[in-house]
Amino acid sequence: MDISSLLSKTNWTDPNLDLLIHEVVEYDMRDGGFSIIQEHRLIPEQEIQRIRRIKDKHERHVTVGNLSRNKDYQGLSKLMAEGFRQYRIAFGTTNNLGLDDIVSIKKDALFVKKYCYELKFGDYIEFREKNVYQGFLRIGKLECYWKEDSVDIKGVSDEILDAHHRDFTCKVIWRFMKYLVQFDNENAVKYIVRMMNDYKNLRLDPGYYRTFDDKSIYPVTTLGNQLIIKEIGPELLQFCNVEYNYKTVYIPLLNIATLL
């Protein structure tokens, strides 16, 4: 596979990479779909001008998304997808990226192992250096990107993470990865074993027991019935099925640490 074929993929992460202690730089395309619309004039000029007047980035993004589903612009979504593909390839080839430089590919972003300096293509397409991470860790289908003050998780929506997990499971992953980034494998093992014991014995805050996924619920068994609860107090914690996070987060972390 050559670099152009790889960058044609819309969603790809190196399947052979479970742990990387190395800088990973995230480059994303500014104003994603709208920049492609402007560059290739995919909609009438009056519509482009209308969207330009929308100052709020999220609102502009939603407006572009709605256009791509509008029957008056059939084919727009496909043209935008082709535009993303075209400029991912342009970014990679212009910056001489090799296959081994790519950690992950998203629709409008690349996670790579080196700094890139050719960021502007045409009049409207511009990539930006969004994040610089010091480590990468894969836990099942989750991708964890570590930096000194936080960990970014791909595979659970940011809204769910912000609402429920930043102070709990995300902190466990962040601290565990901090030990790995510092090449302190011994304390990484000690830390995760201690957390696993506290987790199994229900000594942690209820927030740690919320399933670490987009459902983000508490599976509870009481009186022989299976319940799905969105909020829980200490009195119900003893009925919570804690296996999900234990099997999908804690055991994989321990396996990674003990194999180093």
What does each model-found stretch correspond to?
Residues 1-260:
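Conserved acidic
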